[in-house]
Amino acid sequence: MAKEKYDRSKPHVNIGTIGHVDHGKTTLTAAITTVLARRLPTSVNQPKDYASIDAAPEERERGITINTAHVEYETEKRHYAHIDAPGHADYVKNMITGAAQMDGAILVVASTDGPMPQTREHILLSRQVGVKHLIVFMNKVDLVDDEELLELVEMEIRDLLSEYDFPGDDLPVIQGSALKALEGDEKYEDIIMELMSTVDEYIPEPERDTDKPLLLPVEDVFSITGRGTVASGRIDRGTVRVNDEVEIVGIKEDIQKAVVTGVEMFRKQLDEGLAGDNVGVLLRGVQRDEIERGQVLAKPGSINPHTKFKGEVYILSKEEGGRHTPFFNNYRPQFYFRTTDVTGSIELPAGTEMVMPGDNVTIEVELIHPIAVEQGTTFSIREGGRTVGSGIVSEIEA
């Protein structure tokens, strides 16, 4: 059966849920899909239950390629792709790939707890990876009888957001109960609809980088028997069309060429994929083992693999979940670019003995294998699975 075409008539926006473990991110995601399916029944709006979204349980072995649930839904005004990023600290890596895919996010905070360590961490990560627009959903308000307590929690959340340069005083805070809405309580269903109209209004339609040269960070690779190899990910910038020639850049010294033979989004065929779309790209002339997560698909000649660069970095303080001790010259952490970790060594500027948690500094980095980078590429510095710094490439050296 031919796949149905993907409808482009509404503006498309990528959002997601972030926040502390057990504060109700996944329940809210389920509530949004379920309430929209009840109130605005369309072919896109299908209810998803908690279990089907919760695709990344904490007890599952790590090393799953990606543990982020993607759901789609629409309001009267827009089409949304929604990412549910798991809450546990072990999945911060995922938060980084997930948050990088959001035009805006709903920060879920349980009214019973208020902001918790991962609330802070996710706000910080959002700031680092360029998620500029946050809306707060204070969940579980049905469990709090004291109006003053709710006001205090809201103030605390707003202060925390301001601390990380978000407009804490001005951004929208919606109080509700995802579980009650999911169970069909009309009052709380109305609040979900209010939340979605706030998302429609407050998160601006993203400026898509469609005019720039194609860059698509590869998140996952699989092969379709008889058709070829598919690389999937979110198009960072540019467009990809059937018959385009692309280059596969990074990890390996050599740049490989391939031809695009198909583009799909949400299992529907597209004529072209645009910046911001989560797509699967079918490639001719590439074996399944010749392309991997961490590489990028790019317009030929637009980006090269590099191992040496200068970067401006901020090293997280102990309070932000960073290191407790300084590091010295030749420190060898992992550098997390787009979808993958690469080990590299850090050279400090002349005269700098060491870098303390909370410092920012210009460093020279040498990676153990090349990555597609350019001036302005952002990265995180990680060690043993936790983020200890964030940075941006200021100058390419080799």
Swiss-Prot record:
Tell me which residues bind Mg(2+): T26
- Output the Gene Ontology terms for molecular function: GTP binding; GTPase activity; translation elongation factor activity
UniProt region (G1), positions on chain:
19-26
Q: Where is this region: G2?
A: 63-67
Asked whether the keyword Acyltransferase is assigned, the reply is no
Can you say where in the cell this protein is located? Cytoplasm
Known InterPro entries for this protein? EF-Tu_GTP-bd, EF-Tu_GTPase, EFTu-like_2, EFTU_2, G_TR_CS, P-loop_NTPase, Small_GTP-bd, T_Tr_GTP-bd_dom
A Pfam family: GTP_EFTU_D2
Q: Where is this region: G4?
A: 139-142
**Catalyzed reactions per annotation:** GTP + H2O = GDP + phosphate + H(+)
Q: Which domain of life is it from?
A: Bacteria
Q: Where is the tr-type G domain?
A: 10-207
What family does the entry list?
Belongs to the TRAFAC class translation factor GTPase superfamily. Classic translation factor GTPase family. EF-Tu/EF-1A subfamily.
Q: What does this protein do?
A: GTP hydrolase that promotes the GTP-dependent binding of aminoacyl-tRNA to the A-site of ribosomes during protein biosynthesis.
Give the protein's recorded name: Elongation factor Tu
What is the native source organism of this protein? Streptococcus agalactiae serotype Ia (strain ATCC 27591 / A909 / CDC SS700)
Organism lineage: Bacteria, Bacillati, Bacillota, Bacilli, Lactobacillales
